[in-house]
Swiss-Prot record:
Disordered: region residues: 1-20
Compositionally biased spans, kind Basic and acidic residues: 1-12
SUPFAM superfamilies: F-box domain
Cross-referenced InterPro entries: F-box-assoc_dom_typ3, F-box-assoc_interact_dom, F-box-like_dom_sf, F-box_dom
Stored PANTHER family: BNAA05G37150D PROTEIN-RELATED, F-BOX DOMAIN-CONTAINING PROTEIN
NCBIfam families named among the record's database cross-references: F_box_assoc_1
Domain F-box span(s) in chain numbering: 26-73
Transmembrane segments: none
Annotated source species: Arabidopsis thaliana
Pfam families: F-box, FBA_3
Gene3D superfamilies associated with the record: 1.20.1280.50
UniProt name for this protein: Putative F-box protein At1g50870
């Protein structure tokens, strides 16, 4: 890590020297490089990518590891909500920030959406997944795919194992080394090994990693990578008998497995990050007793969980909305994020603040315009499946 910082600083010293030497002596440098970088760090990512086409100097500046790391670090403190839906062979992608509101009143406002569309690889399968430090994983049959929404690029990776007919894919990120790793397992059978690939490595080869337990991931639930650890639900093979669901953890840096017992008598509809920790959410929709049970992992080694109960927040806001919205996650500020499962023209997001017991409604105008819909062949077609990622950040 220290070596990387030294190399980055050396690159900047050389660039300053090269830049100053190219300027005539009679010319005064009005804008120092440090100030330029600070300005660039505050710009939207779309503007930064455009500047790469201005000149070689701008390209060099905006692709320098110091700048990209700084930009990504700043973005990670302000995650966005990313959504997309499929139409024929294209993905229609929308991103917008989570705005914290201080008002105690239930209110709504509109916001324009940053959107684009992109053609995706043929036969691509879109399972439930998450955005991990700016990257999202999919698959084509038994070939994993990595998608970078910021750069609008897809990377198709080789098969991790030729004999596997089914594949479970988990994407992780090591914040210490700044590396993404892909961990894949046989989807159909219990196994005590997996395949791991480090993205961006020189040879990008799959490595065989042993687990301490034979297990199989539960397909209907996706994993979460939190602070360099991948968590996912699984069944453990105990001498030929399949156990009740448990949580497996995979530390991205050390590539070690461990198990975490679920809270007694509970199950998890979904795993989410909550205040920097793993949380299990049980979301029931019963009119009388419905609500959200949130179990937060306090100590992974001792399997200690804390519990909070939130009574049917959607029912208190509007009972008619319960079947239209789904819980997608929790913001850094502790607000529950509810998104529409389907929509026709415009769509909106509900944020519930349990501390203030208040809702705010954010309506987005990006798909409401008839010109937008007609120009992209959407017409009056209803979107029946909206994919959402509540903690998306920029990744170059």
């Amino acid at each position: 890590m220290e070596q990387r910082e030294e190399n980055t600083e050396r690159i900047h010293r050389e660039r300053r020297k090269r830049q100053s030497s190219s300027i005539p002596k009679t010319t005064t440098l009005l804008c120092p490089l440090d100030l330029i970088l600070e300005i660039l760090l505050r710009l939207p990512v779309k503007s930064v990518l455009r500047f790469r086409c201005v000149s070689k100097l701008w390209l060099s500046t905006t692709t320098d590891p110091y700048f990209t790391n700084s930009y990504e670090a700043r973005s990670s403190t302000r995650p966005s909500l990313l959504m997309f839906f499929k139409n024929k062979d294209k993905l229609f992608v929308f991103t917008f920030p989570h705005h914290n509101q201080n008002s105690k009143e239930t209110h709504s406002y509109s916001q324009h959406v940053d959107s684009y569309h992109i053609k995706y690889p043929k036969y691509c399968c879109f399972p439930f997944t998450e955005s991990v430090h700016g990257l999202i994983s999919f698959r084509i049959s038994t070939k994993p795919i990595i998608w970078n929404p910021t750069m609008r690029q897809f990377l198709i990776l080789p098969k991790p194992e030729k004999s596997w007919k089914g594949l479970s894919v988990f994407l992780g990120y090591d914040p210490v080394e700044g590396k993404h790793k892909l961990m894949c397992m046989n989807r159909d059978n219990t196994s005590d090994e997996c395949r791991v690939l480090t993205l961006g490595s020189a040879q990008e080869k799959w490595r065989r990693i042993k687990s301490n337990l034979k297990h199989r991931s539960i397909l209907r639930y996706y994993g979460q990578c939190i602070n360099g650890v991948i968590y996912y639900q699984a069944y453990i093979d105990q001498m030929g008998f399949i156990s009740n669901p448990t949580i497996m953890s995979f530390e991205v840096r050390s590539e070690k497995f461990d198990t975490i017992t679920l809270p007694s008598g509970s199950f998890a509809n979904m795993l989410i990050p909550y205040q920097g920790r793993l949380a299990c959410v049980n979301n029931t929709m019963d009119d009388v007793n419905g609500g959200i049970t949130l179990w937060t992992l306090e100590d992974a080694e001792k399997h200690i969980w804390s519990c909070k109960l939130f009574l049917a927040p959607l029912a208190h806001y509007d009972r008619s909305l319960k079947t239209d919205f789904k819980l997608d996650g929790i913001t850094h500020a502790g607000e529950f994020i509810y998104v529409l499962s389907t929509f026709l023209k415009s769509f909106y997001v509900l944020y519930f603040d349990p501390k203030k017991n208040s809702f705010r409604k954010v309506e987005f105008r990006g798909t409401a315009y008839e010109v937008f819909r007609l120009s992209h062949g959407l017409g009056n077609k209803k979107v029946n499946r909206l994919y959402t990622f509540s903690h998306h950040v920029t990744s170059f």
